[in-house]
A protein has these predicted regions:
Chain B
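C-terminal boundary and immediately downstream tail of ABC-type ATPase nucleotide-binding domains
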Residues: 2-3, 242-267
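ABC family nucleotide-binding domain
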Residues: 15-241
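ABC-family P-loop ATPase nucleotide-binding domain
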Residues: 1-24, 264-267
Length: 220, 267
């Protein structure tokens, strides 16, 4: 088969696997991960020592161990203690935990980057800590965290290829299957790379648009 | 009522709005307050002056719970004594904040909210007053400081003087018993200082109770009923402005006043 034809015939299934596997996997994990990240960031900066310590340990474990190992512990490890999780939930679980750990540090730094005077102005207006956070601090921290969180998201999209190793039929696993049939590794894997690249390009454009939107109120 | 009349009237009338006794505060090795007393009557303007590091801002911030003194007693409007030997509860700190409002050196406006939303945030969401009333009052206050046309602007679109006037309006909208000003003009370009001081002076003349930390001695002389000169964490001297500025009793006060009014003399 001609290489160009192979490219044309493989890009369809690979892109489809991106749409049905990679993108939903990344999107769902990112949303759960952000919730975890926000929670962990708030725990980390709280004055409650135990909460803070728990968050610190969680972040340390996530950042200090390979994602692939985390994935294997959940998918291949947990069954040995009687917990069997399907490929998809395993992947979402692992990726969410991962985003949670990295995102927590991003959000913590963003919260700390908001000047102390903002807290004080809110307090003197009678606001409590929770209201100050939600109304005053987090909206400002959100702007600061867009670029680093976009990085996290883009990394996540690429990291979902690891899910092929726990049998999730996402983009890369589909590419592997096509390559195994055709033996044209170069073309097939370059096609896979191209699709990842296009997805990440779109995400970068989204990041730019979001930054512009959030920049409306801020002097630059 | 002339200034002197008002001053006589307040100092002699009923119990003080606020008394602070023997405030002590230490930041690490640095003892910034070494026993400061302050009495504030309703309708009175008290101005704190002194060199930087003298503790005047810390005194101000102790009055609304932004700082917690290590020792000392605070009484607000005949309420229970707050003895700082035991750290005050959250409720106590909130009670202090609810009675006062603060204008900051760096305005601390909320950059993501428009001018009007900066002003109504507290009255609407914390005090839960009706929106119509809050909006009308906020617009009235913006009009009186000449910023009616800026209500939908964002803080970064305003000049420093305008930002600080919004800061003042935001404080007034809370209807506090006590206004606290923390060096409200120190961060402004010199040509913008006047427009802010004029507003504060008007509020003083209207009978708002306020404590002002400032380096603007001319303003202190004009607007204050009572001036405290702090140095090294103690009140070195206090009294009505005429007395303190024209006939300071202490050498430290004299030196400070000279340094500010004639900065080139020592050169």
């Amino acid at each position: 088969m001609d290489l160009w034809e192979l490219f044309l015939s493989s890009i369809g299934p690979i892109a489809l696997a991106g749409l049905t596997g990679t993108i939903p996997l990344a999107l769902i994990s990112f949303v759960f991960g952000l919730v975890l990240a926000l929670g962990a960031a708030l725990m980390r900066i709280s004055e409650h020592r135990i909460l803070s310590a728990v968050a610190r340990v969680y972040i340390s474990i996530i950042r200090g161990t390979p994602l692939l190992v985390q994935l294997f512990v959940i998918f291949y490890g947990l069954p040995s203690i009687g917990v069997v999780v399907d490929p998809w939930p395993s992947a979402i679980f692992a990726f969410s935990l991962n985003v949670g750990g990295y995102g927590a540090e991003v959000i913590r730094a963003a919260i700390l980057s908001v000047p102390k005077g903002q807290w004080e102005a809110a307090y003197t207006a009678g606001m409590g800590r929770t209201r100050t956070l939600t109304r005053i601090i987090l909206p400002q921290a959100a702007r600061v965290s867009v670029p680093p969180l976009s990085n996290t998201f883009i990394s996540l999209v690429k990291d979902t290829s690891l899910a092929s190793l726990i049998l999730v039929s996402e983009l890369f696993r589909t590419a592997q299957q096509i390559a195994a049939f055709s033996y044209k590794f170069m073309v097939v894997y370059l096609t896979a790379a191209l699709v990842y690249w296009v997805i990440c390009l779109v995400l970068s454009l989204g990041q730019d648009a979001l930054e512009k939107r959030l920049d409306r109120h801020v002097a630059r | 009522m002339s200034h002197a009349d008002r001053q006589r009237a307040v100092r002699s009338s009923a119990p003080p709005l606020l008394t602070a006794r023997e405030l002590h505060k230490r930041f690490g090795d640095n003892e910034v307050l070494k026993g400061v007393d302050l009495t504030l009557y309703r309708g009175e303007v008290v101005v704190l002056i002194g060199p930087s590091g003298s503790g005047k801002t810390t005194v101000l911030r102790s009055l609304n719970g932004l700082e917690t003194p290590d020792a000392g007693v605070l009484t607000l409007d005949g309420g229970p004594e707050i003895d700082f030997v035991t750290p005050p509860s959250k409720r106590t700190r909130f009670a202090l904040r609810d009675r006062s409002a603060m204008v900051f050196q760096h305005h601390n406006l909320f950059p993501h909210l428009t001018v009007i939303n900066n002003v109504i945030e507290g009255p609407l969401r914390v005090q839960r007053r009706p929106k119509d009333e809050v909006m009308a009052e906020a617009r009235g206050l913006l009009a009186r400081v000449g910023l009616s046309d800026k209500e939908n602007a964002y803080p970064h679109e305003l000049s420093g003087g305008q930002q600080q006037r919004v800061g003042i309006v935001r404080a007034l909208a809370l209807r506090p018993d006590l206004l606290l000003f923390d060096e409200p003009t120190s961060a402004l370009d010199p040509e913008l200082v006047g427009e802010v001081l004029i507003v504060i002076k008007e509020l003083a003349d209207e009978g708002w109770t306020m404590v002002v930390v400032t380096h603007e001695l001319a303003f202190a002389r004009e607007a204050a009923d009572h001036v405290l000169f702090l140095d090294g964490g103690v009140v070195v001297e206090e009294g009505p402005p005429q007395q303190l500025f024209t006939a300071p009793a202490h050498e430290r006060t004299r030196r400070f006043l000279t340094r500010i009014m004639r900065p080139l003399d020592g050169v």
